[in-house]
């Protein structure tokens, strides 16, 4: 066996299974950045770094962004674009967000049985496809307003994979141990192939409705998305304040999103409108009946306990009884205690999904530190702040929407709220205008970002899941199926920012439903 040359072995190990062109591109970035920083302009080197980082987010299907983005961030610190102290300042300033990801996501993991039970009953009890789609969309929206969207999508993916596997094993006449549900060669007859294709289309539409539902619900509350918490902290809002502040935009968008769900199903547009095949329903109902009969008293108690913990979670968040991460920790403690999960390795599994994204979010903050130190967004913010107050809202919404549709909305939201806070602290905008800009930034990062899987973490999670190849859900198909929602949510959001945000906020203020927070000019910001 001929030994592999050292340089070839290094390239092979570098970024693992990412394609060679991608590896060489990252190498090129790492080579160009210090040259541009030292010999041309720190400002333009900083902007190139931001573009490079957005590129790594956009190429998330080629390689998880933590490694290439982390290398770029490390190099930026080493060559002096920012300092470890500034990065640490950003991280500590956003510790609530990191706590949310670590503890809340893990906490909801221990409530999966209840969520699986709910979505299973929805799928089997509701026979009308438009009504079922509406139920999935609204259930995902409600859950995402209080829980982590990734966890909600993960649960629905689990339901879909489970049901797909049940029918696939039935159609291929294989046992649970021997079946490979990704292999269709064992299917018996053309009818089973046709039925399975129809079932795939049915599951695709349900998953997309649920994914959009997480965006519709997630934009409404401060815990719905990680960037919401960053924005809420910067603006000085609690849970109820955040909901009321967003409502002039989010409530009309929610209503129009729900109408879109019904219309695309009713008129069978953009790949929607496919019904659950009758023979698949019979197989799934038989399986559910069998599982219900096997459910023990202990299993029933676990479901009841998880439902009670869910009520505690909603009350604790609504009344801000503690920081979000601590509420998540309380969920972990209660759910594991009363559901009998006491082994360390079993508890450890709950943290697996959140930790990579938590690490990536810390890298985001390093890039934000570069943006602050190099004042990269100052020209853009200066340009926007030359406009009238209403034009500022529209421009912030559109700038956020455009970037969020191609990049990660947590990163975009963090950057823009930071710049808006800086403008307020330097006296360029008033406190009421800053509060309105925070609404425009939050809705801008959350609503148009459904356009592509790059923008919404839940969409990216769905696309990279083991379910996507089973139901033939590709990147292009996701973009097409998201298109009606993208158009409606973006345009309705824009119109609301333009016409309803200011008068309705004034109405809430005059009736003492909301008030201006006591923000200190010298306070730390997100």
From Swiss-Prot:
It is a multi-pass membrane protein. GO terms for cellular component: plasma membrane. Its main location: membrane. InterPro entries: Na+/H+_antiporter_NhaB. Keywords: Antiport, Cell inner membrane, Cell membrane, Ion transport, Membrane, Sodium, Sodium transport, Transmembrane, Transmembrane helix, Transport. It holds the Pfam family NhaB. It catalyses: 2 Na(+)(in) + 3 H(+)(out) = 2 Na(+)(out) + 3 H(+)(in). The chain crosses the membrane at residues 14-34, 35-55, 99-119, 122-142, 146-166, 206-226, 239-259, 307-327, 328-348, 357-377, 397-417, 451-471, 479-499. It is found in: Cell inner membrane. Belongs to the NhaB Na(+)/H(+) (TC 2.A.34) antiporter family. PANTHER family: NA(+)_H(+) ANTIPORTER NHAB, TRANSPORTER ARSB-RELATED. This is Na(+)/H(+) antiporter NhaB. It comes from Pectobacterium atrosepticum (strain SCRI 1043 / ATCC BAA-672) (Erwinia carotovora subsp. atroseptica).
